UniProtKB/Swiss-Prot annotation:
Pfam families on file: PsbM (PF05151)
Lineage, uppermost ranks: Bacteria, Bacillati, Cyanobacteriota, Cyanophyceae, Synechococcales
Membrane-traversing stretches: 6-26
Location of this chain's protein in the cell: Cellular thylakoid membrane
GO biological process: photosynthesis, light reaction
Family listed: Belongs to the PsbM family.
Basic and acidic residues bias locations: 42-52
GO cellular component entries: photosystem II; plasma membrane-derived thylakoid membrane
Name the UniProt record assigns to this protein: Photosystem II reaction center protein M
UniProt region (Disordered), positions on chain: 31-52
Length: 52
């Protein structure tokens, strides 16, 4: 089956753009895998006041 260069470019962009976007989001987070959902010390806490 023959493919055109347009099809190859479209497939590459279809995979590459979301991958680069997600890697950029991961790198831009300061905590890495830790998020505010699991940690009360991060911004965006689930409760308005921290537990004492």
């Amino acid at each position: 089956m023959e493919t055109t260069s347009f099809g190859f470019a479209a497939s590459l962009l279809f995979v590459g753009v979301p991958t680069i976007f997600l890697i950029g989001l991961f790198v831009s987070t300061s905590d890495g895998e830790k998020s505010s959902f699991y940690s009360d010390t991060s911004k965006g806490r689930l409760s308005p006041e921290p537990k004492k």
